Amino acid sequence: MTRVVHIIGAAFLLSSYAYCGLSRFNEHDIEGGDSYKRVKREFERLGSKWLGGTINYYYADNNNSVKEKVKSAIAYIANHTCIKFNEDPTHWQRLKIFTSELSHCRSTIGAPGTRSGSAGELSMETGWCANIGSIVHEFSHSLGRYHEHTRPDRDNSLKVTSTDYEARPRPWGMTTMYGPFEHGSIMMYHSSNYGVGKMEPYDMEYKNTMGSRRVTFYDMYKINQYYGCGCSTQLECKNGGYTSPSDCSRCNCPKGFFGKLCNERRQQDSYELKATYGRWQTQTISFNYKPEPVSDGFYSTFVYITGEANSTIEITMEGLENVICTAGCTWNGVEIKSREDSRITSPVMCCKDEPLYKKVFKSLHNPTIIELYSKETAPSTATFKYRFMNDKIVFG
């Protein structure tokens, strides 16, 4: 559990375009020790936040199909953060949103009228944004967030040999940390974005996870932390959730957990399986996209596998049908939530020729959750085996 939103700290960077555990570090966890206090103050002084946490915006054109995706992205962010959206073309601090197919998919970083520029208007282009998640990505830039792969600590997780200007890491003095590095973040590019072999994860199980456009739990958490979102009364949220600043009567829940306190299952597309000791059982689950009132453009089916107390749950994939193999697994895929922090994205698979396929995943989470996600309406299937053992494991 840690703290990271890549937010601006220097004017010469702020005007550039960008394309597409909930405890925090203490000051001694970051290089410089006591100097971190100074760095954080400097960041807050030079930062480029939307005042009052409100994005004032208007549309430059009228591509209705793209506007619907923009509206869905707005609804998703507003539902998970304290950020407000106000359609007002005359506000002194405003965002001009282009939806024409002639526009790109990019945004200036940070709010207008602050350190990102003296003008009261900046722009965001959405015409080429393929899905809702891509537009959430661009709004995140406007809210002040850099790409995940440019974090100053990225070299602990990525081997980047690209000399591309946009691939360079941001220095410590220009960021402040609000969460863990996440390969599956919506702000991460796929591994071949700068060329084959130019940006590889040290943990190669994450290669196809990079470039996802599913919004993660930590993606929204980091925005909440940067903007100081919170509630005067904290709920007793379960399973790593926290009181939602958009509605203080409920919790923001990690994926797979539902209800006011994150201690419930969803009533539909939810499967409970009980593992047996030492003996593999086989299960096939069908999954496909279904519309929801608030969505990042994907729909997930969840499988909950339980074993005896203090046991190790083991899972291995046996088959994937109608699952599209692509960088970032951006159409559909399978995530077995086996990593130590169950709120962070575990490695995602969508290809039969990758190392994850047929690997035996070992997890101490009881239950261990399998998330089967899709933005395709045609059904896909995943076949897997599961059991529990009593051996000890090291997370990973």
UniProtKB/Swiss-Prot annotation:
Residues at the catalytic site: 138
Query: InterPro entries, per this entry?
Result: MetalloPept_cat_dom_sf, Metallopeptidase_nem, Peptidase_M12A, Peptidase_Metallo
Start and end residues of each Peptidase M12A domain: 44-230
For this entry, list what GO says about its biological process: molting cycle, collagen and cuticulin-based cuticle; proteolysis
| Cofactor binding note from Swiss-Prot or TrEMBL | Binds 1 zinc ion per subunit.
GO molecular function terms attached to this record: metalloendopeptidase activity; zinc ion binding
The answer to keyword Disulfide bond applying to this record is yes
Entry GO terms, CC:
extracellular region
Q: Does this UniProt record's set of keywords contain Protease?
A: yes
Give the coiled coil ranges: none
Required cofactor names: Zn(2+)
Note the SS bond partners: 82-229, 105-129, 231-251, 253-262
Glycosylated sites? 63, 79, 310
Localization (cell):
Secreted
Cite the EGF-like domain residue spans from the record: 224-263
Positions that bind Zn(2+): 137, 141, 147
**Signal sequence region:** 1-20
Q: Which UniProt keywords apply?
A: Disulfide bond, EGF-like domain, Glycoprotein, Hydrolase, Metal-binding, Metalloprotease, Protease, Secreted, Signal, Zinc, Zymogen
The EC class name is hydrolase
The protein's job, in short, is: Metalloprotease.
The protein here is known as Zinc metalloproteinase nas-24
